């Protein structure tokens, strides 16, 4: 669980102060092992955020400047971590709600274990197959009923490997607007 408050005070070279509050909860449910899979897990994630200063503004050099956070800190969906079928920050507004569910399987069989070059240079300890679905919505204000209407969704498959102590992943996801492929180091949930 993470509760975070981020504020830019507008000091130094900052052109606009902003405030963002967000909450994220990730939970993992072990389904145990089988003859073919050494680990089976259902991973769930919930995230919500509100750009508290979204409607505030000031006049700078004769221009009205809104106190909104940069895209990577605000209430946005799309990209490497949330709503992976959509482009980065495809949806951006004052508030957001997001849900994700992943089914993760680590097979007993490791095809990389017997390849000397891979074993020596990459040391792939395990590989993982995933199936996932995501649901989310941005909104002009943090209103629980508004944020749960006309929600966007996507679903996809992923392949992850633990190489040299780091998780590398490739995910492909589809949505009503098309599909997206993402490659990244680390699992999609922040914790």
Q: Model regions: which residues?
A:
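Transmembrane beta-strand segments that form the barrel wall of outer-membrane beta-barrel proteins
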Residues: 1-10, 83-88, 131-136, 166-176
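C-terminal outer-membrane beta-barrel translocator/porin domains of Gram-negative envelope proteins
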Residues: 1-122
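Residue-level detector of the transmembrane beta-barrel scaffold of outer-membrane proteins
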Residues: 2, 41-45, 100, 128-132, ...
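Solvent-exposed loop/turn segments connecting transmembrane beta-strands
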Residues: 8-17, 89-96, 149-152, 170-185
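Repeated loop/turn-to-beta-strand initiation elements of outer-membrane beta-barrel proteins
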Residues: 32-35, 108-111, 161-169, 191
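Outer-membrane beta-barrel transmembrane domain signature
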Residues: 55, 102-110, 116, 120-155
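Internal helix-turn-beta structural module
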Residues: 151, 155-164, 173
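Outer-membrane beta-barrel "beta-signal"
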Residues: 159-163, 178-191
């Amino acid at each position: 669980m993470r509760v975070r408050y981020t504020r830019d005070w507008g000091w130094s070279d900052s052109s606009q102060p902003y405030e963002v509050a967000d909450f994220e909860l990730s939970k993992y449910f072990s389904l145990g092992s089988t003859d073919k899979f050494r680990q089976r897990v259902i991973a769930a994630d919930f995230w919500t955020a509100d750009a508290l200063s979204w409607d505030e503004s000031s006049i700078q050099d004769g221009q009205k400047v809104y106190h909104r956070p940069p895209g990577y800190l605000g209430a946005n969906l799309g990209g490497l971590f949330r709503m992976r079928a959509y482009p980065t920050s495809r949806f951006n507004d004052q508030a957001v709600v997001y849900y994700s569910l992943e089914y993760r399987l680590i097979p007993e069989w490791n095809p990389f274990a017997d390849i000397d070059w891979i074993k020596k240079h990459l040391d792939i300890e395990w590989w993982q197959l995933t199936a996932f679905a995501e649901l989310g919505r941005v909104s002009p204000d943090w209103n629980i009923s508004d944020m749960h209407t006309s929600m966007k969704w996507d679903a996809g498959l992923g392949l992850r490997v633990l190489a040299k102590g780091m998780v590398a992943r490739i995910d492909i996801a589809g949505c009503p607007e098309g599909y997206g492929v993402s490659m990244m180091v680390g699992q999609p949930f922040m914790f």
